[in-house]
Amino acid sequence: MLELIQHDSSYHLWAPSAQEKWYLITSLDDYSRYILYAQLLKKETSWAHIVALETMILTHGLPFSYYVDSHSIFRFVQGRDSFWRKHHTLTDESDPQWKQVLYDCNVKIIYALSPQAKGKIERPYQWLQDRIVRTCVRENVSDIRQAQTILNQEIRRYNFRQVHSTTQEVPYFRLQKALTEGTSLFREFKVRPPYQSVKDIFCLRLDRTVDSYRRVSFKSLVLKVNGVTQGDKVNIRIYPMNHLLSELRFWCNDRLVDVQRAKNRDLHLSIL
């Protein structure tokens, strides 16, 4: 059954001519071995992993569960992550942003408990490293966009043409057979009330209390909010629109009371 999505990132010198390592974020269906998402990035952030969730879920639907390691992006560990949480994150929630998205989607998270348990997802990385590095060397690739093009080509070849050594099937056809036979645990994604938009789900979150001037603040940024009174608890859903601007959706008592835009630099938000 299609019940588990293996999700991870790998930091590697994908294109030696670039003389810098990049992150590769992937999502892989455990049953069919079909690679659902693959993106090269210069920086690994919570938002990058949320974008991976959004892309995968809006394209393929909701899986039963995600399988990840204990990286701080996926799981808060008291002691290990306390300093990071207090000084370097957008919010002061102990539940990581990525985890909160899956909670809203009603998708279970399974954490790897040992290096051996991660063997499934590390095997595709070894294969990708071999293929992509060789191609990037042969074509003298030094730009991440060129490397992404090569990655996309390799993923298509793997998904649609390569017979997997374990399943003895091409991933795409194994995936389609399960969908046709109704043995898939993927569910259609729908925005659940009270939320109204995918921007309310695939986003960053921030909780604040309204002051006597009907404002909320974060560091140096002060925002006046419509539809609230002093003492109200506001949940701000932050949806980065691009590398400069984000949309802020203010929720209070399960109602969308205001929508504003703010500069990412004022939010101290880096998404690249």
Which residues are covered by each model-predicted region?
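Acidic/histidine-rich, metal-coordinating catalytic segments
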Residues: L58-L90, L113-P115
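A structural microfeature
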Residues: L36-Y37, D258
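Short, conserved catalytic/metal-binding motifs centered on acidic residues
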Residues: D8, R33, Y66-D69, K118, ...
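C-terminal, beta-rich DNA-binding module of retroviral/retroelements integrases
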Residues: I155, N159-L272
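The substrate-binding groove and active-site-proximal loops of carbohydrate-active enzymes
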Residues: Y37-K43, W84-H88
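Mobile-element integrase/transposase regions
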Residues: M1-I35, K42-L53, L58-F64, K99-D104
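An acidic- and aromatic-residue-enriched active-site/binding cleft used to recognize and process polar
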Residues: S10, D30, L40-K43, D69-H71, ...
